[in-house]
Amino acid sequence: MTPFLPDRSIAKRFDAAADRYEHHAWAQRHAAEALAERIAALALPAKPRILEIGCGTGLLTRALARRLGPADWTLSDIAPDMLRQARANLNLPARYLRMDGEHPAGLDGQYDLICSSLAVQWFGDLNAGLARLTRWLRPGGHLAIATLAQESFKEWHQAHAVLSLRAATPEYPPVADIRAGLLPGRVDSEQHVQSHHSGLAFLRGLKGIGATAPRAGHQPLNTAQLRAVLRQFDRQGACVTYQFAYGQWRKPRGVFVTGTDTGVGKTLVSALLTRAWQADYWKPLQTGLAEESGDSATVAALARLPPERLHAPAYALQAPLAPWAAASLENTCIDATRLTLPETAAPLVVEGAGGLYVPIDERSLIIDLIDNLGLPVVLAARSGLGTINHTLLSLEALRARKLPVLGVIMSGPPSDDNRRAIEHFGRIPVLAQIPQLDVVDAQAVDLWSKQLPTLDSLLSSNASR
């Protein structure tokens, strides 16, 4: 597969700067060391699989290698001469990959850590690019980045504004707006002030690191305008602020429980998995509260969950309807793109609403939420007549979106024929057949949860498929 390389002008600028990059990269060195300190505090496994986006000449790589020790490295950059320079600078066994990190391709599996220092600010859509990177994280894996935020180069912008001009430097987002899909995490920031001999020295420094690509739509200044800006910048003190934003996100170890339809046993399956794995539970979209106490209360009772392992729904609605319809009755607007997974060190079981094509809002279905959350699926299905068709259709829909499925759990009178057909044509294991239970209570959940495979075994099997 040929990596997606959308803006070759950016790559050319960094290629031209590769040999002299580290002579000018004082701010970049500071950010790399600060990010490496944050990464070193994460709970990473021994010899972690690491993917670095925009490795440049290896500043972050070296800072991490000193702190983490042996690792399985994949170092990527959009600029081939930067990769050449990194090879020369690093004494590490690593895979070097020319790739645009905003649209990753050519990768060989998932990673314990995906990291990047002062490269992702070149993404055309920062948050969308970060969300794509999270798909390459292993369950429990971390995404850690340093990027530029809104206050960066404010003195340079001020020197232009005084003259009613606009700077060519790109516009960076506020710290609060930086997100990595729907993963839980945090972004902190610091302001780093760098002094220069003059405005001309500042521009030469930017050229020295290849950071001269202008923002979209910029009209170049004429010579007189540029000289006036440089004089104003010098009068201001020839200092420039870098606002570094450090983002850290973790992909939970867990599953998304969805069903072939409504009323197929998703809540029982969720309770069984929560009990078996000592997991946290989250039902992000709860409807039907006018008629019952809700699935969160049911799972808490069945799985004997303490309050701290039960996460409140993001939306709790009264009508027993699909979330979109129920929300409209209450004049509530659901925004599925703003849902964020709970932050927890425990395994996490997320239960959906109805089947895959249940509407959440005017733009999103449950299958879109699964895609955005990035958790593998456990599919709840009936055991009886009609389940083969419903289950295979659901599996086909998930595969069409390249969404990982760990297995199917069937509920109702056991049918070996239906189980065999689903495993054969669906090419997926049936993890359990839960019979029709006379009494559904915590004791029954205790008993049947012991029949389920461990989360680690399911994740390992999925990785090998």
UniProtKB/Swiss-Prot annotation:
Residues annotated as the enzyme's active site: 283
Record GO biological process: biotin biosynthetic process; methylation
Main location: cytoplasm
Pfam families given in the database record: AAA_26, Methyltransf_25
GO terms under cellular component: cytoplasm
Domain of life of the native organism: Bacteria
Annotated localization: Cytoplasm
Cofactor(s) for this UniProt protein: Mg(2+)
SUPFAM superfamilies the record matches: P-loop containing nucleoside triphosphate hydrolases, S-adenosyl-L-methionine-dependent methyltransferases
Assigned keywords, A-Z: ATP-binding, Biotin biosynthesis, Cytoplasm, Hydrolase, Ligase, Magnesium, Metal-binding, Methyltransferase, Multifunctional enzyme, Nucleotide-binding, S-adenosyl-L-methionine, Transferase
UniProt pathway: Cofactor biosynthesis; biotin biosynthesis; biotin from 7,8-diaminononanoate: step 1/2; Cofactor biosynthesis; biotin biosynthesis
Record's keyword annotation contains Cell inner membrane: no
Region (Malonyl-ACP O-methyltransferase): 1-254
GO terms of molecular function: ATP binding; dethiobiotin synthase activity; hydrolase activity; magnesium ion binding; malonyl-CoA methyltransferase activity
Catalytic activity of the protein: (7R,8S)-7,8-diammoniononanoate + CO2 + ATP = (4R,5S)-dethiobiotin + ADP + phosphate + 3 H(+); malonyl-[ACP] + S-adenosyl-L-methionine = malonyl-[ACP] methyl ester + S-adenosyl-L-homocysteine
Positions contributing to ATP binding: 234, 263-268, 295, 351-354, 435-437
Coiled-coil spans in chain: none
The protein's Enzyme Commission number: 2.1.1.197, 6.3.3.3
Region (DTB synthetase): 255-465
Binding positions for substrate per the UniProt entry: 287
Binding site for Mg(2+): 267, 295, 351
Family: In the N-terminal section; belongs to the methyltransferase superfamily. In the C-terminal section; belongs to the dethiobiotin synthetase family.
Job of this protein: Converts the free carboxyl group of a malonyl-thioester to its methyl ester by transfer of a methyl group from S-adenosyl-L-methionine (SAM). It allows synthesis of pimeloyl-ACP via the fatty acid synthetic pathway.
Protein's name according to its UniProt entry: Biotin biosynthesis bifunctional protein BioCD
Organism: Bordetella avium (strain 197N)
